[in-house]
């Protein structure tokens, strides 16, 4: 079985593949201070009886990746390991000014999106930041957009405005909030949906094509219900990319 690990700034998504089938997945908090020993205990607890025969990793957190490398050496002996970094074969041409700036997770999303849907495509990843990544008809990564993530925006409001606080991220009963909680929820959910819809429309106009828009990331399931432009929901898009890149390198 393939262990796929996507280390993000806030959360780490872990999946186990049996062939092309995602047999299980977990979302845990990313801790850049965690030691290799702590990670060994964590992953042994998650995996239980699963017999891992390969590991595929991407990370946007260098400190976390260093400990993860040591964990893999300790916990998994004599099995192939692929870490997505410069020099790794991905099959994705990176057509931006400085290809080294493209995060490994964005390249995995590009790879998976083109594999599943072809192109052109727009991947909207609702994570710590909201990323829109653009995939050409040939599967090239041609650029993207960064915007503050929903939780970052909510944290900023709660910390900077004395009368506001963090709320559950669900759609309120109406766009016009009847309470502080509903007003915040409306701004977060409908506001982000409107922002994404506006950006997707602008991207489609610039590409002059109706590119498929794919939502992924932890909060995608909330926003896609309120969006007018998001076409598909693939919650494990990055993990699928990790499976594909493993196959290309082993």
UniProtKB/Swiss-Prot annotation:
Principal localisation: cytoplasm
Annotated ATP binding sites: 6-13, 128
Reported cofactor(s): NH4(+); K(+)
Listed pathway(s): Cofactor biosynthesis; coenzyme A biosynthesis; CoA from (R)-pantothenate: step 1/5
Example of a GO cellular component annotation carried by this entry: cytoplasm
Keywords: ATP-binding, Coenzyme A biosynthesis, Cytoplasm, Kinase, Metal-binding, Nucleotide-binding, Potassium, Transferase
Reactions that this protein is recorded to catalyse: (R)-pantothenate + ATP = (R)-4'-phosphopantothenate + ADP + H(+)
Binding-site positions, substrate: 103-106, 180
One Gene Ontology term from the biological process aspect of the record: coenzyme A biosynthetic process
E.C. code: 2.7.1.33
Enzyme class (EC, first level): transferase
Sequence positions that bind K(+): 125
InterPro entries named in the record: ATPase_NBD (IPR043129), Type_III_PanK (IPR004619)
Co-factor note (free text): A monovalent cation. Ammonium or potassium.
Keyword Membrane listed: no
Superkingdom of the source species: Bacteria
A Pfam family annotated for this UniProt entry: Pan_kinase
Task performed by this protein: Catalyzes the phosphorylation of pantothenate (Pan), the first step in CoA biosynthesis.
Family stated for the protein in its record: Belongs to the type III pantothenate kinase family.
PANTHER family, per database record: TYPE III PANTOTHENATE KINASE (PTHR34265:SF1)
Name under which the protein is recorded: Type III pantothenate kinase
Recorded name of the encoding gene: coaX
């Amino acid at each position: 079985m393939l262990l796929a690990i996507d280390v993000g700034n806030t959360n780490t998504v872990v999946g186990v593949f049996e062939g092309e089938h995602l047999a299980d997945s977990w979302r845990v908090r990313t801790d850049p201070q965690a030691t290799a020993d702590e990670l060994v205990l964590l992953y042994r607890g998650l995996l239980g009886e699963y017999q891992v025969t390969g590991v595929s990793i991407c990370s946007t957190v260098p400190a976390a990746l260093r400990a993860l490398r040591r964990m893999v050496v300790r916990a998994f002996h004599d099995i192939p390991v692929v870490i997505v970094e410069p020099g790794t074969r991905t099959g994705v041409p990176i057509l931006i000014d400085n290809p080294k700036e493209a995060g490994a997770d964005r390249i995995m999303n590009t790879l998976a999106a083109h594999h599943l849907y072809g192109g052109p495509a727009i991947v909207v990843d609702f994570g710590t930041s909201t990323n829109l990544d653009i995939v050409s008809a040939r599967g090239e990564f041609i650029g993207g957009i960064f915007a503050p993530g929903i939780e970052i925006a909510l944290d900023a409001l709660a910390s900077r405005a004395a009368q506001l606080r963090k709320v559950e991220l669900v759609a309120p009963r109406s766009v016009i909030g009847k309470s502080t909680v509903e007003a915040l929820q409306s701004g977060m959910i409908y506001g982000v949906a409107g922002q994404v819809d506006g950006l997707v429309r602008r991207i489609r106009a610039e590409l002059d094509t109706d590119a498929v828009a794919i939502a992924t990331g932890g909060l995608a399931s909330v926003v896609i219900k309120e969006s007018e432009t998001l076409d598909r929901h693939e919650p494990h898009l990055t993990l699928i990319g990790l499976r594909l890149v493993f196959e290309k390198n082993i």
